[in-house]
Amino acid sequence: TLTEFQGGPQEIAAMASGDIDISQIGHGAHALCIEGQAKIFHLDCTSLADAVVANTEKGINSIADLKGKTIAVSSGTSAEIILNLALSSAGLTQDDVTLVEMDANGMVSAMVSGGVDACATGSPSTLTIANALGDKALTLATNNDYVDQVTFPSSFITTEEFANANHDVLVRFSRALLKAQD
């Protein structure tokens, strides 16, 4: 059964409660694996899914134009890192903008309704926003802009208990992933 989550911490909590056995996490949740809350069993890829997206109708045509604007972000995510790198590239910091804490679904709604001027989020939200705003959507920065500075790994994880009891399942799962990528 496939279950969708808003982020890695929620996935790891669902594993800890026994609701799911395996999950795929992005960059930020790897810290929880380092803390021992989950076990990485398959490195998936490096992510290029994050972006800072702005609405040009809000007077934003460059990263520098974010100064004084309201930006939706989910703290602790790789998208927030991209936002910080983008701001820095224009000589700005988070102190120069108004940040609004929001999950990915909220960002889509806020961008479409005009409730925020820009957002830092990942796919598929970036695509949904671009489709909804059309020509008014402007991607200001992505992971690709900073690959020489930071890498965002994605991995498949499980609990230590599931890994110990189901080694063969994890091997078959990993082999299936590799075969699908071939």
Q: Language-model features: where?
A:
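Extracytoplasmic/periplasmic, Sec-exported soluble proteins
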Residues: 3-7, 22, 44, 55-58, ...
